[in-house]
Amino acid sequence: MFSSVAHLARANPFNTPHLQLVHDGLGDFRSRPPGPTGQPRRPRNLAAAAVEEYSCEFGSAKYYALCGFGGVLSCGLTHTAVVPLDLVKCRMQVDPQKYKGIFNGFSVTLKEDGVRGLAKGWAPTFLGYSMQGLCKFGFYEVFKVLYSNMLGEENTYLWRTSLYLAASASAEFFADIALAPMEAAKVRIQTQPGYANTLRDAAPKMYKEEGLKAFYKGVAPLWMRQIPYTMMKFACFERTVEALYKFVVPKPRSECSKPEQLVVTFVAGYIAGVFCAIVSHPADSVVSVLNKEKGSSASLVLKRLGFKGVWKGLFARIIMIGTLTALQWFIYDSVKVYFRLPRPPPPEMPESLKKKLGLTQ
């Protein structure tokens, strides 16, 4: 599979100009016409520089594997770091009478459980979101290449927002299957006092009570929450980066240093995160209540909460998701920089399309 994807990636519109030089300029140089001295012509220095600049080809198995590793770090570490805020948010959703607001929620939790109580659920959070990040970012890169090659260069540019939405939705579908068991255990630990304090205690107890259903009954609401969230996260980020370089950053991306590019990544990530929190919050409320209660269904929970109830805890979630999304993109892009992975610039209109639209002579 990866070999076919790598082959498609070579001509992909999201590929970098440097990598195109690698593919076009570093073929079998013995087949090149001989030079004036009769020796085979050597590849251009520019292509050689591109080989030294990147650690792997765009679209190779190594590229996708390292993108997945970047997803593990970006999602696993950030979600674990905000466990206290997530815990209070979940408790506000399932028991709004007791936890009346974000500050009151922290106060009540500290009073009843102490400082250690704020870390409840850290293990399933780390494991679950690490697996989710692996699938989310790794498969996004795969689907982006596959879908863009199905569309062709010109349509990829014209319909790039739709492509981002489709690729991210496809990736998140699989990512949520990996996340669901750990998310169910996390919510039980955080919202049911006395049920279990650790993943080791919660998982066997859940299986004994409800079987495998206990771990996957929340997967459909997870799709409801995470797929819109991820579609917004990737599409909004990609287009915000494009807009920042076009209208805000005073110089082209190619002239920006790596730290400057990472600042743009962080800002675009935070903007995307605010929108992510808003579109996914109602489903997040349903997931929190559903995983707390035995024998309940998403439709019953949604009916009971009502329109006002599903928006409880939104402010806390905007703070959490905005910061979270910005840090995730920053970490993910930093991993690409560290491992010297290809980082294509924002897409530009193909020359063939410019000619069709009469934008060039």
From Swiss-Prot:
Residues 1-49 form a transit peptide. The keyword Mitochondrion applies. GO terms for cellular component: mitochondrial inner membrane. InterPro entries: Mitochondrial_sb/sol_carrier, Mt_carrier_dom_sf, SLC25A3/Pic2/Mir1-like. Keywords: Acetylation, Membrane, Methylation, Mitochondrion, Mitochondrion inner membrane, Phosphoprotein, Repeat, Symport, Transit peptide, Transmembrane, Transmembrane helix, Transport. It is a multi-pass membrane protein. Inorganic ion transporter that transports phosphate or copper ions across the mitochondrial inner membrane into the matrix compartment. Mediates proton-coupled symport of phosphate ions necessary for mitochondrial oxidative phosphorylation of ADP to ATP. Transports copper ions probably in the form of anionic copper(I) complexes to maintain mitochondrial matrix copper pool and to supply copper for cytochrome C oxidase complex assembly. May also play a role in regulation of the mitochondrial permeability transition pore (mPTP). Interacts with PPIF; the interaction is impaired by CsA. Belongs to the mitochondrial carrier (TC 2.A.29) family. This is Solute carrier family 25 member 3. It comes from Pongo abelii (Sumatran orangutan).
